[in-house]
Amino acid sequence: MSEVKMLTAPVPNVPWQDRPAGPQNGAPIWRYSENPIIGRNPVKGVARIFNSAVMPYGDAFIGVFRGEQTNGIPYIYLGHSKDAIHWDFEENKIPFVDENGDPFMPIYAYDPRLVKVEDTYYIIWCQDFYGAAIGMAKTTDFKTFTRIENPFLPFNRNAVLFPRKINGNFMMLSRPSDSGHTPFGDIFLSESPDLVYWGKHRHVMGKGSEWWESLKIGGGAAPIETSEGWLLFYHGVSGTCNGYVYSIGGAILDIDNPSIVKYRCENFLLTPEEWYEERGFVPNVCFPCATIHYSASGKIAIYYGAADSYVGLAFTKLDEIVDYIKTNSVVTPADTEIGRR
């Protein structure tokens, strides 16, 4: 097994549960035995929390959570935890403001990602901007949340920032499309010097040839910087006679030019199998949005939305998952090119 290192700040109190005994099929990922960690009706007026992002904050953890209100409109709620497993939520949705400090709430907001770049925390979500589009905000204290200009035109979803600048610029993955529900579904990379003006758009990877990602794909958790490249957990979607199936996939992107895919796992890493993944408001969904990881031990905790109803937690080790992705890698010419045509 190759020795792979995380090039990230240490988080010694990463949530963890050892691999269960007995044979294991497929990828070296195992579910938390007490899943789901967030159930139904977690907050007054909120029916379901899912597709949410968490990260270390001080000596504890903080998160931004997709809360599906009882009226069916999604918003983003703030949560706090001492162990990143048991969460307390603020009853009011996050109060976004504009650059002048005046209230500036999106019509709706869902599927947030949370990424720290330098000394600022960024929230990226999907919202209505004359169609499905990317919304962004920043905070330094999780008290004031200032909206940033919309980075892209509609239609676009599943955006996530890289956790550091590359070649002096912010980098963001996203999935543009020609409608809100993505007749085409490839991941693209864009860069910006200031989070306002975005360009140098590059194709990263397209839907795969395997059944689990044959319809579309989309970015998931913020990429993890490693000695092998950027480790990306993403989602792949297949279509069945009973609707979509969302699975978790893995890829490794070039460290200096993330539009180049070095390795891409042919197999899914996690697919709906447990009751909380197969049964819910939208059945058969595993949707990754965040990881917490410890560089010294290689431990990775993966947070994912389950069946649009719950939050699940899974675990892996860096060297094992990288080896699995490399051993089972199948890349296409479109994956390995620089993505400029």
Regions found by a protein language model. Give the residues of each.
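Catalytic core of Fe(II)/2-oxoglutarate
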Residues: A221
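C-terminal substrate/ligand-recognition segments
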Residues: C289, H293
